Regions:
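Acidic/polar, glycine-anchored loop/turn motif associated with catalytic or activation segments
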Residues: 1-84, 90-155
């Protein structure tokens, strides 16, 4: 979305000048609807459309940010950068909001190697990725689903 020129995404205004793979100035929560294809939705729309109360949205956003901070800390201890991730929340019959689905797996998250700890926060146009984006990137470049065995092994 950003690469196509949008600067307001998920109700958040992003500054001009971000480069691909550049760390954002702040951690952001980017909610989506759940379906065959996830669609962006703003926090305001979530409340206005009755998906959640403002209080429940604030609770979920707070928990998502805390989980992400925890994930980044744990990843860094292992020489990794937790780039982004997906959290899914649900509600029990008694109304309690809970985290559902997987947490910080390679299927729900993107990880990069910290190649040089001294350059951890510097821009890296070609980070070493440890996730399924390797396969996605190959398919985009070659337009082929004939994925070499060595690439599959790498993933």
């Amino acid at each position: 979305m950003y690469q196509s020129g949008q600067r307001e995404i998920y109700g958040i205004n992003f500054r001009e000048g971000y480069r691909a793979n550049e760390k954002l100035d702040n951690v952001v929560v980017t909610p989506t609807t759940k379906g065959e294809h996830d669609h962006p939705i703003t926090p305001k729309e979530i409340v206005e459309q009755g998906y959640l109360s403002q209080e429940d949205y604030d609770f979920i956003e707070d928990r998502a940010l805390k989980l992400f901070e925890f994930g980044q800390t744990e990843a860094a201890k292992r020489g990794l950068i937790l780039v982004d991730t997906k959290y899914e929340f649900g509600r029990l019959p008694n109304g309690k909001i809970i985290l559902i689905d997987e947490l910080h797996t390679c299927d729900s998250s993107r990880y990069w190697l910290i190649e040089d700890p001294l350059e951890y926060n510097l821009y890296n146009p070609n980070p070493k990725k440890l996730d399924k984006d390797i396969i996605r990137d190959y398919i985009k470049k070659t337009d082929s689903y004939n994925i070499p065995e060595e690439l599959i092994t790498k993933v």
